Every structure is written in structure tokens, then in C-alpha cells.
Design a protein with these regions (language model features):
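Extracellular/luminal low-complexity segments enriched in Ser/Thr/Pro
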Residues: 93-105
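N-terminal secretory signal peptides that target proteins for export/translocation
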Residues: 1-18
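Ser/Thr/Asn(+Pro)-rich, low-complexity disordered segments
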Residues: 134-404, 417-590
């Protein structure tokens, strides 16, 4: 049925229509005269043309000698958006790609409008020298690294990788290690030759204890004692034990103590020949010793964003100190993580990875980013080698987050297809992917179309969901958001597992990881869109009504600030000084 006319739009009487037509004719005549006299009302003049403006992005950049930086120009006020590029100190293509020359100093890149040659915009480019390479290989009868001393039977060729770790050209024999490994319980200061990846056991220190005795994860047969003969392909990881366990603060969570009895580790790699000065250390899991090169890093792919809250932005040096030394990641629950600088819980690893990667998206100079970039890429290389060797970090509550991002970060910067496709070659080895799933994929397929509160993407539970949609373990350890809260499985009448871990120990640590991948434009190579949709849900979904309904149906209360969706800061507050950094970055750049 057609809507009736509104009283104000109904036709008037005939005289009124006539008056309206007279007025319309006068108005048209006036408009015609105006069009002949121009905008200023002066006969014979044309309207002022729009002003052409041009801007350039970024307005400043720091580039190493011989490296490239992409610039772009934005034109307004004309349909001709063509620009003419020019540069000092290097060359620039017609597409705005600048290549730095060999001279160090400050130079400019300029974009000039071809519609109006009087309009241009310039950016300042600081060309810097590359970071000095490690010293060239030499000979030595012993070497010292971060408190570990290895003594050889004779002088051998030694050198350092780009991250500072040592190599020797083998074969060699180690006759002494300081501090010396103990030969009886408690087993301290252990050295392990060629870390195992099959069973998650450790040989560094027998005092494994995270509040309960975990010593069954220790295997004394993994320990090596001098004399140790090493051949090319071998990797010796030597450790220093803490004098007393549970004394080091947990990295990224200051109120806790690290669960590990290991203070620090150093890695000695045995090669058949000295590598180039820009070589990364091969992964400690990689017996084939694949070597990647720092000079191959596409550092210009890192954005140069303004810190949204400078006072809440941590210094690069803090995370350089965390990642400079090896993060050993082959013990099933990180009971032997080097406590001085590595977290002993997956959630805290994910937080550290988030901070490190997001810092590298900011507008620090190229020189300032070099060290942390190298260290973070080295961690990615190590993890990738372990994945290739058959190790993985499948879902287990909050233990297995944080390992995928460093691999993909390294893969993007090295343009390495194997790293970029790690989850294609090795499905079901990353906690974040197994614990985020579209609800309609839960078996039997098509049974569920939405979660209890309407969400399409849900938390996959403690053990998660495999890439093929199969549930690792149903019930207590499986997905549950497809059910009403009254039907959620319980550990006991006073404890939930799934929702408690969703809010305490997993989701909150994935936000920075997802944002870093967005900023690298690497969502496709992550190869699991449910992860990004879930993180968006965590940050944008108002859970006020859901929390009230959970309380009404089950009696469990998740209303504490640190348990709420839409934040990371309340979990980090009091644990890390710059606790709003991830939230600030999300608000500004997501």
C-alpha cells in the first residue's frame, strides 16, 4: 500500500501553484545571470581553480647504505595525480622507491605535482652505515660467552654469528666447561649435545619444579661431560644453574617467580667452515645447519609508526636484553627456560613477542632497530628449525602461545617460503590456531551455527581443535562456547577450566600478536583467519551481558577488570611498567 502524502507535501490551490511558477521563473533567470558573471559576480571572469596540494609519506626515514625505502605522494585538488620524483643521496624510481647511496648523512626525497610544478613535498632521509659486523674469525684455545667458558684441546678456528653466538670450525674436542657440570644429584650446570625434539625432556638441571615436583621431565642421560668431541653439524648447549630455584622474577610478570632452575644458556655451533659475517646462527634443532643472512632481511617492510603514547612505550634496549641470548624451547612446559631473560610460560612469551614485534613497527631509526630485529629473527629461525625437526607447541591451556609469530616475522623479512608456510607444512603445532575456531566447524559439521551468546568464532578449549575440525579432547578439555553456560563442563563444582583459561591465560596475550601480523600485512600467510576474527571479537565485543548471564546460569563471576574482554592492560598492570602499550597500539592502528 502506498504511503499517504504528508500534509506539508500535499498540492495547494491553483492560485498558489501559479505564484510558485512565477517565482521559479525569476529564480531560473537569476541563476542564469549568475553563471555568466562568474563566482565573484564580475562579467567575463571564471571561477578560481581549486588549489593543488601534495603531501609525502613518510615525512622522514632512516635507511642504511644500499637499502631501500618506499615513499608515496598524495595529490588533492586535481584529477592529475602524476608526480615527478627526485632525490639526493641516492636514487628514486617513478614509483617512489628510494635506494640509499653509499654516503652517510641527511638527504631528501621530493615529489612534485605534474599538474602544478610549483607544488612539491619533501621527506628527510638519514642514510646510516650498517651495524659493524662481528669480528672476523680467528683462533683460540677457549672462548667465553655469558658466563660459560669452553676450553678446547688445541687452538681452533672460532667466530661469531650476527647475533653474537659463537661457532667453531670442527672437528674439535672440549676438554673443560666452566662452570663445571655436576655428576650426581642435584644435577646442575648441564650441557646437552644436540637437543632432543622427540619427548620434551631436559638435561640441564634436575630441580624442575613449578610448585610441584616436575623432575620426571629431567633426563640425566642427555647430559654430556668433557671430553666432548664435536663434529660439524653438532650443537652444544651449556647452562648455568641458579643457586636457588624460584628466585628470578618471571619475565613479563614481575609478581611471579620463574619456574625454571636454569639461570642462562649459551650455544656453541660446530661448522665445517666459517660463514660470512652477516650469518645468523643455524637453529639449535637443525642438524643440516641452514644458514640465513642478515643482509637478506627486508627491513624496509617494517612500518615506521608514531608511538601512540610515548610515555607508555618501552625502550628497545629492554627487549634487546630479553632476546639477545638463546631462548631454548624444546622442553614441553618450559621448566628449563633460562630464567634470567626468557619467560617460563607461553602466555608470557606471547606478551614478550607482542611487545618486541610492535616496537619494531615504530619510527625508531633503522640503526636503532637493527639489534632487536636480528635477535627476534634469530628466535624465529630457532623455532622454525625445531618445527622442521618434528617439535611443536600444540594447544595446552596457556602454555603454547607465542611461537608462531616469530617464525612468520622471520619468514616475511627473509622472504622465506618455508617459514611463511610453516602451518601449512606442520598443522596442529601452534596453540593460537588450535584454540580459535569457527563454531560451525565443530563436529558434527553444521550442528552449531553460533555460540551461546551469538558469536561465530569461539575459543577452542584447553586442548583445542585440529586443522581438519576434529576436536582433540571433548568435554572438560574441549570447546564449550557452543553450549549454554549451565552446561559447561567443570573441574569440580567450584572450578571451570575453559572459560577461566579463555579469560586469564590465552586470549589476552594474542592481541599484540594479531596486530603485529596486521601491520606486516601478513594475514594470509598466517593461514588461520579464525585467529584474527577471534582477537577482533575479544577486543570489540562488549561482554557485560554475557558475564551477567554466565553468573546467572552457573554462579561463576568473570567481572574483574583483568578477566574482561576489550583489553590487555589490566592483566599487565602491576606486572610490567608500560602495561598499556598493546592497547594503545591497538586503538591507534587496528
Amino acid at each position: 500500500m502506498k504511503a499517504p502524502n504528508h500534509p506539508r507535501t500535499a498540492l495547494k490551490s491553483a492560485p498558489a501553484r501559479a505564484r510558485f511558477l512565477d517565482f521559479a521563473c525569476v529564480l531560473l533567470a537569476t541563476l542564469a545571470l549568475s553563471s555568466c558573471t562568474g563566482s565573484a559576480g564580475k562579467p567575463g571572469t571564471n571561477p578560481d581553480p581549486p588549489t593543488v596540494t601534495i603531501s609525502i609519506s613518510p615525512t622522514s626515514a632512516s635507511v642504511q647504505e644500499g637499502s631501500t625505502k618506499q615513499f608515496s605522494a598524495t595529490i588533492a585538488g586535481t584529477s592529475n595525480e602524476n608526480v615527478m620524483w627526485s632525490a639526493t643521496g641516492g636514487t628514486v624510481t617513478t614509483a617512489g622507491l628510494y635506494t640509499a647511496g653509499a654516503a652517510v648523512g641527511m638527504f631528501t626525497v621530493t615529489a612534485k605535482s605534474m599538474a602544478d610544478n610549483s607544488k612539491s613535498a619533501s621527506a628527510t632521509v638519514t642514510i646510516t652505515a650498517p651495524a659493524p659486523p662481528p669480528p672476523p674469525p680467528g683462533t683460540a684455545s677457549s672462548i667465553q660467552k655469558d658466563g660459560i667458558t669452553w676450553t678446547f684441546s688445541k687452538a681452533v678456528t672460532v667466530g661469531q654469528f650476527v647475533n653474537g653466538d659463537y661457532f667453531v670450525v670442527g672437528p674439535v674436542t672440549i676438554t673443560a666447561i666452566d662452570p663445571a657440570p655436576t655428576t650426581s644429584s642435584p644435577y646442575l650446570n648441564g650441557s646437552v649435545l644436540n637437543l632432543p625434539t622427540a619427548n620434551g625432556k631436559s638435561g640441564f638441571d634436575s630441580r624442575l619444579n613449578d610448585g610441584t615436583d616436575e623432575s620426571w621431565w629431567f633426563d640425566a642421560t642427555l647430559r654430556s661431560y668433557p671430553p666432548i668431541t664435536l663434529k660439524p653439524g653438532d650443537v652444544l648447549v651449556s647452562s648455568i644453574s641458579l643457586a636457588q630455584i624460584h628466585t628470578d622474577p618471571e619475565v613479563m610478570r614481575a609478581s611471579d617467580k620463574s619456574a625454571s632452575p636454569v639461570k642462562s644458556v649459551s650455544v656453541l655451533t660446530v661448522l665445517s667452515a666459517a660463514p660470512s659475517a652477516d650469518a645468523f646462527r643455524p637453529s639449535y634443532c637443525d642438524r643440516s645447519q641452514t644458514i640465513y643472512h642478515a643482509n637478506s632481511l627486508q627491513r624496509d617492510l617494517l612500518p615506521s609508526l608514531a608511538p601512540p603514547n610515548p610515555s607508555a612505550t618501552p625502550p628497545l634496549a629492554q627487549f634487546e636484553a630479553y632476546y639477545r641470548r638463546p631462548w631454548i624451547d624444546t622442553n614441553a612446559f618450559l621448566f628449563d627456560a633460562p630464567a634470567d631473560y626468557m619467560p617460563s610460560y607461553g602466555q608470557h612469551i606471547a606478551f614478550a613477542d607482542s611487545y618486541a614485534s610492535l616496537l619494531l613497527m615504530l619510527n625508531f631509526t633503522a640503526d636503532q632497530k637493527v639489534n632487536l630485529t636480528n635477535y627476534f629473527v634469530q628466535y624465529g629461525i630457532d623455532l622454525y628449525g625445531c618445527a622442521q625437526a618434528g617439535y611443536g607447541w600444540p594447544a595446552f591451556g596457556g602454555h603454547r602461545s607465542g611461537r608462531k609469530l616469530p617464525i612468520l616475522f622471520a619468514g616475511v623479512l627473509l622472504n622465506n617460503s618455508g617459514m611463511k608456510n610453516v602451518s601449512v607444512a606442520h598443522p596442529n603445532i601452534f596453540g593460537e590456531d588450535m584454540q580459535t575456531v569457527y563454531v560451525n566447524r565443530l563436529p558434527p559439521a553444521g550442528t552449531f551455527t553460533a555460540a551461546w551468546q551469538g558469536a561465530k568464532v569461539i575459543y577452542g578449549g584447553h586442548y583445542g581443535v585440529n586443522a581438519d575440525g576434529s576436536v582433540v579432547s571433548s568435554g572438560l578439555y574441549g570447546p564449550y562456547e557452543q553450549l549454554q553456560p549451565a552446561n559447561w563442563p567443570l573441574i569440580n563444582p567450584t572450578e571451570q577450566l575453559g572459560e577461566a583459561y579463555r579469560r586469564c591465560c590465552t586470549s589476552v596475550s594474542w592481541v599484540g600478536e594479531a596486530l603485529a601480523i596486521h601491520l606486516l600485512h601478513a594475514e594470509n600467510i598466517w593461514n588461520h583467519p579464525a585467529f584474527f576474527d577471534y582477537v577482533d571479537r575479544w577486543m570489540t565485543e562488549d561482554d557485560t551481558q554475557a558475564i551477567a548471564e554466565i553468573r546467572a546460569q552457573s554462579g561463576f563471576d568473570y567481572s574483574a577488570n583483568w578477566e574482561r574482554q576489550g583489553q590487555t592492560r589490566f592483566w599487565l598492570q602491576g606486572e610490567f611498567p608500560q602495561y598499556t602499550f598493546i592497547d594503545d597500539m591497538w586503538k591507534s592502528y587496528r
